[in-house]
Amino acid sequence: MVFDYKFFNQRDDGVHCRGCTNITIQDCEFYTGDDCIAGCANVNVLVTDCVFNTACSGMRFGGTNILVRNSKFYGPAKFFFRGSLSKEEKRDGAQAHRPHRVNMLSAFTYLADFSVPILEEPGNIIIKDCTIDNVDRFLCYNFSGNAHWQTCKPLASIKFENIEAKDIELPLTAYGSAELPVDLALKHVNVAFREDVEAVDFLHLVHYGNVRLDDVHVTAKGKLHLVKYWTQGDIILNNVTCSAPENEWIVAAEEEFYCKAI
């Protein structure tokens, strides 16, 4: 299945695939009122040279062997969020107007629900050579149980490489499963939080196995922690800088994180 040189303008989900194998999405531009690319239980997926602009998630996606590369994620959205419109309004092509929001919630949000069987273990998701600009967060993996789109099967591993991210507002969330802790890798990643953010954590970690940061640089004007964790796992730092005192880089959470479903 190949989508190439497509222009998605003011739709719900731009592309939605479930239970598919060997998908290529290339040279596409997404300007959507819902997720740009969505779906779960997909295997062998390539997304390359695309533009993502939405009031929801750039990708709300799950599967095995997924590569996203050479793409741009940015907000605010061209169109207002369409998720609050009724089915009739969506069917009739109604436009979302104020006070619907235009902030982009996440570059990548994990998806694994019960709509189709998930036959292979989700994991080996790689996002590389991308820019992320004015997006609330660049990962939302929330297997805490309150996000019904992320309750079927947990994610085994995800990696970000060669990422330039700026004007980020919220932590990168990796809330895995106790039965299958998530492995997270970040390599050659630069992150700058929005200047008006008074206090923020770069990573929120729960039920993680191995978290590795190589050549990662994080800056914020306000108070910053590099990692805040609730459960124990392995955290490896190599050539990392952070605009916070080093003794405040990695701290334990005082209570379990509440992850808002998005």
Residue spans for each PLM region:
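Extracellular/periplasmic carbohydrate-active domains that bind, remodel
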Residues: 1-262
